Amino acid sequence: MKKLLICTLLLAGAFSAYAQGEKEVKTGWSFGLLPTATFSVDNGFQAGAFGDIYNYGDGTTYPDPLHKISWEASYFTKSHRMRLYLAYDSKYLIPGMRINASVTYVNDPLYSFWGYNGPASIQDYDIWYNRETSPNINYYGMSRKMLRGLANVQGRVTDNLNWAAGVNFWKWTLGDMGGANTPYDKNLTLYRRYQKLGAITEAEAKGGIALELNAGLVFDTRDMEAAPNRGVWAEAYLNGNVLNSPYIKACLYFRHYIDIPIHIPAGDPGFAYRLAWQQTRVGETPFYMIQNVPLLVQRNMISEGFGSSNTIRGLRENRVLAEGLAWANTELRVKLVKFKLFNQYFYIAVNPFFDAGVITKPYRADVLGHTAIDPELVFFKGKNDPLSIAGYRGTIYDDSNIKNLIYSAGAGIKIAMNQNFIVSAEYARCFTDGLNADPWIGIGINYQF
């Protein structure tokens, strides 16, 4: 990714910036394609490709496209995760309505499960890093396969106000760590311990299916969608599962984009913030769905719980699992330079940010109690010799930490083509004790919100 950024900066210097008076207009088809050269502490290096395909027609809707197709095919070297994704989005396919649909398949033979209720689940770095000296132990490991198909539609109520409805189908297959070459002890995992404690029920331990229905309202005054300069984007809706384990979630999202009138050649800087809340109001979410963050319009391939580039940056993936979550994201967006190259319009921007959140409704706290331990962790066999973790008492859960504020800060850099295909690289650090994923690096596409 560094090589990509350096090459882009050199090209920007080699080509003169386009004139201030030149009007940016794209017509016809535009293609964005990049290798998925990313890295994360959870999954390792990612190999594959991703991209977007845009159709701008005669250019009258630019910078918003008439049609957008997104796709990804990738594999992660550390977790052996495989991801396949295909999505379509358009406000113009059916006059007066917006259509959003996608199909996603993910195979995670070494998925990390960190426990419930975020700060209450003690993330023991001795266990995590002792995989170097005791390679048969991966305490936080399990496997999961996910197949998802979704379709959402929006229609006009009044100016800037739309109704929205959708359907999401999920099929989950869960189990012990998979793969023929997996060296880990499948009996010594948090996934197995939670089953013994009753925090994961027998009916859901191997996965299940869900059919979610969404319905609500969307208020949108943004000047553009991919990287708004000004406007408000708010959503209020209900999300409910009608199969197996029924539940209803209430979801509220408010995003505000503010143009800062400091005129620089590349464009005015902007300040953006998001306030979000989701909580289960009726029923209980099954284990295989608890990490999900339901959205009306998917901006990224995966939208899951606290601990990702979609919610609070700086945490491990899906580090905070709860029935109710509230969070805020704030960031400054500053364009450094813009230029024209190969008949495409580019800009480079930076975005320092601050994220924070809290648990508003714990998940199965009554089952786990005030504290939970795993006595098998105090002494366990390494690959060759018995290994004792110095000072470890086997505590895996402490509910006195549930209400701790979760907060992080960091910065990112963006490279945008035609204002829509945006490559993003971000670094963040979480300052809540026991939750920091060091290093946390997120490389993908689009602004977070």
In which residue ranges do the predicted regions lie?
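Short loop/turn motifs that connect adjacent beta-strands in outer-membrane beta-barrel proteins
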Residues: Q20-S30, G57-L66, Y92-I99, R156-W163, ...
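Gram-negative/organellar outer-membrane beta-barrel architecture
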Residues: G21-F31, F39-A205, N310, L435-Q448
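Residues that define the transmembrane beta-barrel architecture of outer-membrane proteins
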Residues: W29-F31, N43-A47, P65-H67, H80-L84, ...
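Transmembrane beta-strand segments that form the barrel wall of outer-membrane beta-barrel proteins
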Residues: S30-F39, D64-T77, G231-V242, R313-N318, ...
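Membrane-embedded beta-strand positions of outer-membrane beta-barrel proteins
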Residues: L33-P35, A49, I69-A73, I99-V103, ...
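Transmembrane beta-strands of outer-membrane beta-barrel pores
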Residues: F39-V41, I53-N55, A73-S79, V103-P109, ...
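C-terminal outer-membrane beta-barrel translocator/porin domains of Gram-negative envelope proteins
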Residues: G216, R222-F342, T360-P362, G369, ...
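Predominantly the C-terminal beta-signal and adjacent terminal strand-loop region
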Residues: L275-W277, K414-F449
